[in-house]
């Protein structure tokens, strides 16, 4: 079973407008409200793949109940911890081929709630083999909270796929608690290293050899339309993907995480892990909905992905 962790979930609200006018009334005819947050995008894709997945994290208030109901409607199992604060909204205004986002920070998590969630995980870890940890830390949680969570998972011999950025990721990399996989994009990798990084294979390879990545089994760097570059142990891979028509790229990284987790769960080899991860990211980008894939095109696309050891 794959357990997905979302500590700062949201209700994702999408408003579609032909024109977005400032300082006046904008009337919306097309509105969608869905359970959101990076980890829940991962969850939906895994569910659509047919993998055994359970969602966990922190939910509070009326809007937390809305997310539970939304997952129930999708027949996705969940075991969230209830908190005192209210779960947040994230609003996307789609207009004139552009997307304007308004993101709430979310509830403040108390120390008691933070400790309670780690105890909550101990109770549900047994059935899981793979843990995905995605997204930002809500207010109140220290920057080393993911490191503490990963340390707990390692104690239970669980594989962890981590998808976060900034100080939360930096804290993990500085700690002794290492995840199985991290999936930075090129911008996030640049922030970690503190200097610009090009698409050069030699530069990418030398970057991933730095001490900061020591102890991490897989480092998979997303390069957008250029595919990916990956390190697994002492092996390095260049992933080339075909050109596709992109409808909505939001959530493609989350779909990629779902592919990584699914491949680990099914014990795929390196080549097929990288192919599954990348094809799911591409399938998400071809859909209007975030965290959604159409498996009709799976075989056609995956056959065009090339993985080369370099």
From Swiss-Prot:
GO terms for MF: ATP binding; phosphofructokinase activity; tagatose-6-phosphate kinase activity
GO biological process: D-tagatose 6-phosphate catabolic process; lactose catabolic process via tagatose-6-phosphate
Keyword vocabulary terms for this entry: ATP-binding, Kinase, Lactose metabolism, Nucleotide-binding, Transferase
UniProt xrefs under Pfam families: PfkB
Catalytic activity: D-tagatofuranose 6-phosphate + ATP = D-tagatofuranose 1,6-bisphosphate + ADP + H(+)
Pathway assigned in UniProt: Carbohydrate metabolism; D-tagatose 6-phosphate degradation; D-glyceraldehyde 3-phosphate and glycerone phosphate from D-tagatose 6-phosphate: step 1/2
Keyword Secreted: no
The enzyme's E.C. designation: 2.7.1.144
Domain of life, per lineage: Bacteria
Listed name of the protein: Tagatose-6-phosphate kinase
Gene: lacC
């Amino acid at each position: 079973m794959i357990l997905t962790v979302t500590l700062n979930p949201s209700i994702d609200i999408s408003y579609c407008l032909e024109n977005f006018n400032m300082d006046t009334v904008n009337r919306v005819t097309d509105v969608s409200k869905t359970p959101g947050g990076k980890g829940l995008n991962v969850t939906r894709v895994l569910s659509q793949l047919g993998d055994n997945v359970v969602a966990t994290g922190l939910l509070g208030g009326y809007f937390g109940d809305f997310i539970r109901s939304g997952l129930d409607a999708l027949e996705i199992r969940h075991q969230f911890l209830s908190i005192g604060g209210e779960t947040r909204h994230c609003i996307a205004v789609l207009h004139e081929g552009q997307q304007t986002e308004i993101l709430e920070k979310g509830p403040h998590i108390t120390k008691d709630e933070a400790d309670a969630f780690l105890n909550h995980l101990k109770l549900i870890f047994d059935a899981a083999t793979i843990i995905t940890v995605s997204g930002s830390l809500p207010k109140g949680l220290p920057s080393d909270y993911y490191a503490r969570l990963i340390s707990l998972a390692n104690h239970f011999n669980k594989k962890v796929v981590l998808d976060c950025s900034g100080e939360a990721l930096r804290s993990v990399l500085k700690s002794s608690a290492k995840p199985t996989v991290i999936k930075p994009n090129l911008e996030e990798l640049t922030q970690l290293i503190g200097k610009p990084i090009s698409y050069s294979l030699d530069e990418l390879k030398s970057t991933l050899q730095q001490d900061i990545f020591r102890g991490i089994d897989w480092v998979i760097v997303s390069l957008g339309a250029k595919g990916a570059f990956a390190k697994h142990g002492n092996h390095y891979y260049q992933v080339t993907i075909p050109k596709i028509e992109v409808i909505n790229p939001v959530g493609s990284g989350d779909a990629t995480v779902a592919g990584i987790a699914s491949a680990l769960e099914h014990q795929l080899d390196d080549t097929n892990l990288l192919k599954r991860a990348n094809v799911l990211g591409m399938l998400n980008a071809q859909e209007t909905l975030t965290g959604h894939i159409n498996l009709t095109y799976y075989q056609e696309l995956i056959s065009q992905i090339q993985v080369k050891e370099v």
